[in-house]
């Protein structure tokens, strides 16, 4: 059975989001792929679902990888020699152009989304690879022609393109729209790059309208200057499925003299569209942007269900038309965007920005909002439930019936991302991300009938992450004790065991299991630690490490090897630390892991960090600020320039706060640059750069480069040295907003730390707008908390008396299954916000100490970390003991 590559998965998702494939079409293609193998693109073409050109266009639009007409490119021998013939055949890659000065080679890939092939070509050539895509026929022709040593028969070159381009060029010459010199120059470039002639000429200044007028004349079509006044006839639009209209760039707009009038955006698809219509047609040509506006008017909704039924032959176009006419008379469902704004879950400008992205790139509004980090998944689920009239379920608050999962098979739940929640009389409540998935509901009903169960299926909405965790918790559980027994048993069977060979299978099971459990328990890190006689595994949950499992010492090498292989690390190197990163996908779990290994006296230790996604980054309103502090915080981050510092130790939530700020202020009209080590959260719309010391890219060097990139906002992952501190301050003084993190114990110490790094006090006073120091304290578990009396010793150490907290209600968690017996579940931030005003500026210039600056700030209303922590303990959020443990006065 063939397995999908990462590139195939990316392609499938892009085609689905663009509306070029329905869910069922993709499912059928995946089933065929499992049978016949090859690439997903080849399967789609063979099944007639998409043309090769349309797939290429989608890859270019979505991933920025252009198409090269490889059969028309003359490849210099020294360029061809960069990749041996067998490797070119194996990797399905042919180098065709070389920029020696820049150290860049252009390579045509048959599977351009296969990152492993690209990386191998870079390793083999020692050059930076600029990827292009090519068609299968062009690749096979070029491979046989340029690598005769392979002994492949040379097929005929793909026909038609060269002749057409030549005619197009002559036509443009006749019209006087280009010069002979410009045409010859473009043809020379075409020979080098294999790009389309028209595209080259437009890049060189030919107006797009002139190109399309020439194409219309060449193909005998009427050119439409605008589609603004055209109102498509719905009955004409029904002649083409929405997916076909998008696939071929064709919109039927009406009827005249017994002919269907069709507007094209690509004249090459005229014959294919005529064949689909199977009736007389009159074709027009419009510019792509004008055509897209017309397409949106003709096909305002995807009508997925209707298209699936028509494609399956279960519904005629006439019946679909009749149903759509009836649908028009029904009350209009309120758009999701309106609901999100009305519920206060999203800002109007964020919804509008997402709608614009949706129009440009396809996909659903809700997915666009979540992927950009503008909307929390929980908020989306609540809005979808409101829009569709279904209940919203939070499994943490409303746990499932343990017997309900027995009603449905595991593979069905995983395939559709659904979960049987509970029985209510004769109704099965089914958790779904999208209750509109008719195919999922049909298959669930069928599965119930096969078991002789006649339950009504009642959809309810939950987040995808919540459903994933339920599936893993109820269907995917494996006992670690059994895996540990397997390690011990195998070790006992051999007098001289070879850990890697002996325990590889059990090690793989163990690593998968521990990642699964860490994911389900919201752990931030997994620690695999060798000790003298065994191996300890711990999970960091809510900031504290908890023992999780113990393995025999002989299991260490096997487990570490599995971790290294996952991250692409060198399994033979055991003397030096190594770092890596991997996207881990197993079952319903999809999580990014940052891996680190370190030699110790008892063997190698490994740490795996589970990275959050952009959609997990909270809004600034959810960062836990006390009311008065929040207003001052919003005012500071709204300033157009200056430097704002966020301080605290590792694990204090600085990154989350930083990106939450960027999420609010990095609007589309601003150029935002970040330099990080490493990049942990990939945020759409932000230019993110990763430190690379081996290549000489440091924080300071990146900052210098940023200043030449016309930035509005700069984020520095960490100010570590004097040079970085000085350049960051200089950037703030020259009209940029700089957000940076620093390691200090409190807010005032950040000022003296900059001074110690060599930044002049008068520059600090002029550039600094504020400092936020923060810590994370554990929250009292809501499921087992009880009211308690304060401990006298704790009060004494906090400098409080019982009279000072009289009337306050303090809580403590007693320990339960939900919190793992700790009494705490989740974490909450405490803050110390120092806002720089004139008095503090004068104190900085005068060289006042951190203690003196802190006292000035407190007189002006600043709450210290301990004071903010006490406020939140008295609110019942955390405990006095936790505040005492996390703060110093």
Swiss-Prot record:
Gene3D superfamilies: 1.10.40.70, 3.30.450.90, P-loop containing nucleotide triphosphate hydrolases, Type II secretion system, protein E, N-terminal domain. GO terms for molecular function: ATP binding; ATP hydrolysis activity; metal ion binding. It is found in: Cytoplasm. CDD domains: PulE-GspE-like. Signal peptide: none annotated. PROSITE patterns: T2SP_E. Zn(2+) binds at residues 781, 784, 816, 819. It holds the Pfam family T2SSE. The keyword Lipid biosynthesis does not apply. Keywords: ATP-binding, Cytoplasm, Metal-binding, Nucleotide-binding, Zinc. One of its GO terms (cellular component) is cytoplasm. ATP binds at residues 651-656. Its main location: cytoplasm. Transmembrane segments: none annotated. InterPro entries: P-loop_NTPase (IPR027417), T2SS/T4SS_dom (IPR001482), T2SS_E_N_sf (IPR037257), T2SS_GspE_N (IPR007831). The ATP-binding site is essential for assembly of pili. Belongs to the GSP E family. Homohexamer. Interacts with PilC. ATPase component of the type IV pilus (T4P) that plays a role in surface and host cell adhesion, colonization, biofilm maturation, virulence, and twitching, a form of surface-associated motility facilitated by cycles of extension, adhesion, and retraction of T4P fibers. Acts as a molecular motor to provide the energy that is required for biogenesis of the pilus and the extrusion of substrates generated in the cytoplasm. PilB ATPase activity is also essential for T4P extension while antagonist PilT ATPase activity is required for T4P retraction. PANTHER family: PROTEIN TRANSPORT PROTEIN HOFB HOMOLOG (PTHR30258:SF1), TYPE II SECRETION SYSTEM PROTEIN GSPE-RELATED (PTHR30258). This is Type IV pilus assembly ATPase PilB. The lineage of its organism: Bacteria, Thermotogati, Deinococcota, Deinococci, Thermales. The gene is pilB.
């Amino acid at each position: 059975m063939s397995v999908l590559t990462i590139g195939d998965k990316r392609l499938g998702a892009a085609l689905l989001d663009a509306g070029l494939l329905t869910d069922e079409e993709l499912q059928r293609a995946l089933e065929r792929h499992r049978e016949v193998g090859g690439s997903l693109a080849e399967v789609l073409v063979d099944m007639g679902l998409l043309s090769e050109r349309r797939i290429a266009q989608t890859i270019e639009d979505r991933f920025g990888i252009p198409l090269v007409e490889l059969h028309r490119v003359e490849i210099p021998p020294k360029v061809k020699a960069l990749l041996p013939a067998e490797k070119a055949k194996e990797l399905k890659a042919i180098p065709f152009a070389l920029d020696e000065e820049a150290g860049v080679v252009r390579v045509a890939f048959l599977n351009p989304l296969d990152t492993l092939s690209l990386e191998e070509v870079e390793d083999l050539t020692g050059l930076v690879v600029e990827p292009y895509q090519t068609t299968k026929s062009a690749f096979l022709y070029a491979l046989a022609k340029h690598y005769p040593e392979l002994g492949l028969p040379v097929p005929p070159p793909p026909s038609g393109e060269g002749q057409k381009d030549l005619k197009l060029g002559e036509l443009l010459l006749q019209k006087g729209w280009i010069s002979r010199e410009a045409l010859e120059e473009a043809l020379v470039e075409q020979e080098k790059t294999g790009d389309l002639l028209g595209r080259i000429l437009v890049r060189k200044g030919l107006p797009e309208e002139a190109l399309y007028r020439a194409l219309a004349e060449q193909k005998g079509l009427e050119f439409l200057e605008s589609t603004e006044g055209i109102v498509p006839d719905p009955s004409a639009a029904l002649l083409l499925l929405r997916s076909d209209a998008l696939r071929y760039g064709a919109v039927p707009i009406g009827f005249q003299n017994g002919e269907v009038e069709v507007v094209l955006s690509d004249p090459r698809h005229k014959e294919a569209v005529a064949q689909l219509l199977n009736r007389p047609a009159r074709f027009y040509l419009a510019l792509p942007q004008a055509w897209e506006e017309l397409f949106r008017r003709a096909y305002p909704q995807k009508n997925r269900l209707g298209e699936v039924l028509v494609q399956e032959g279960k519904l005629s176009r006439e019946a679909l038309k009749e149903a759509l006419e009836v649908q028009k008379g029904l009350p209009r469902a309120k758009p999701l965007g309106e609901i999100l704004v009305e519920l206060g879950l999203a800002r109007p400008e964020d919804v509008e920005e997402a709608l614009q992205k949706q129009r440009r790139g396809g996909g659903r509004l809700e997915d666009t909002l979540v992927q950009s980090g503008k909307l929390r998944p929980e908020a989306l689920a609540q809005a979808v439930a409101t829009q569709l009239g279904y209940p919203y379920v939070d499994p943490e608050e409303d746990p499932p019936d343990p017997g309900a999962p027995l009603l449905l098979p595991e593979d069905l739940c995983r395939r559709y991302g659904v979960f049987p929640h509970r029985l209510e009389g004769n109704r099965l409540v089914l958790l779904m991300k999208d209750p509109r998935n008719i195919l999922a509901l049909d298959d669930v009903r069928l599965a119930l009938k096969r078991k002789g169960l006649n339950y009504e299926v009642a959809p309810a909405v939950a987040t995808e992450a919540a459903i994933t965790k339920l599936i893993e918790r109820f269907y995917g559980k494996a006992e670690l004790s059994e895996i540990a027994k397997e390690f011990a048993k195998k070790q006992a069977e051999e007098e001289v065991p070879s850990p890697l060979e002996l325990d590889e299978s059990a090690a793989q099971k163990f690593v998968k299991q521990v990642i699964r459990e860490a994911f389900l328990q919201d752990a931030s890190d997994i620690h695999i630690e060798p000790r003298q006689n065994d191996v300890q595994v711990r999970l960091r949950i809510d900031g504290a490490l908890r023992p999780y499992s113990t393995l025999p010492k002989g299991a260490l090498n096997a487990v570490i090897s599995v971790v290294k292989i996952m991250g692409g690390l060198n399994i033979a190197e055991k003397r030096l630390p190594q770092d890596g990163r991997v996207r881990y996908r197993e079952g319903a779990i999809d999580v990014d892991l940052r891996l680190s290994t370190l030699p110790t006296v008892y063997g190698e230790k490994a740490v795996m960090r589970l990275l959050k996604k952009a959609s997990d980054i909270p809004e600034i309103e959810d960062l836990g600020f006390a009311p008065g502090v929040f207003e001052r915080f919003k005012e500071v981050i709204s300033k157009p320039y200056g430097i704002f510092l966020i301080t605290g130790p590792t694990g204090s939530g600085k990154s989350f706060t930083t990106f939450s700020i960027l999420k609010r202020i990095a609007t589309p009209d601003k150029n935002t640059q970040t330099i990080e080590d490493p990049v942990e959260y990939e945020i759409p719309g932000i230019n993110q750069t990763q430190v690379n010391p081996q290549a000489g890219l440091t924080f300071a060097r990146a900052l210098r480069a940023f200043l030449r990139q016309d930035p509005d906002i700069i984020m520095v992952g960490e100010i570590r040295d004097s040079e970085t501190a000085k350049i960051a301050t200089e950037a703030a003084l020259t009209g940029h907003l700089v957000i940076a993190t620093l390691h200090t114990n409190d807010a005032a110490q950040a000022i003296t730390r900059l001074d110690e790094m060599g930044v002049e006090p008068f520059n600090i006073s002029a550039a600094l707008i504020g400092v936020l120091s923060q810590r994370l304290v554990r929250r009292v578990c809501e499921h087992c908390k009880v009211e308690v009396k304060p401990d006298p010793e704790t009060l004494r150490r906090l400098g409080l008396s019982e009279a000072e907290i009289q009337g306050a209600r303090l809580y403590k968690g007693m320990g339960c299954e939900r919190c793992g017996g700790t009494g705490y579940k989740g974490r909450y931030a405490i803050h110390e916000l120092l806002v720089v005003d004139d008095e503090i500026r004068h104190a900085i210039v005068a060289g006042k100490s951190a203690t003196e600056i802190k006292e000035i700030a407190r007189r002006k209303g600043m709450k210290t970390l301990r004071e903010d922590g006490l406020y939140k303990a008295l609110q019942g959020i955390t405990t006095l003991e936790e505040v005492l443990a996390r703060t110093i006065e």
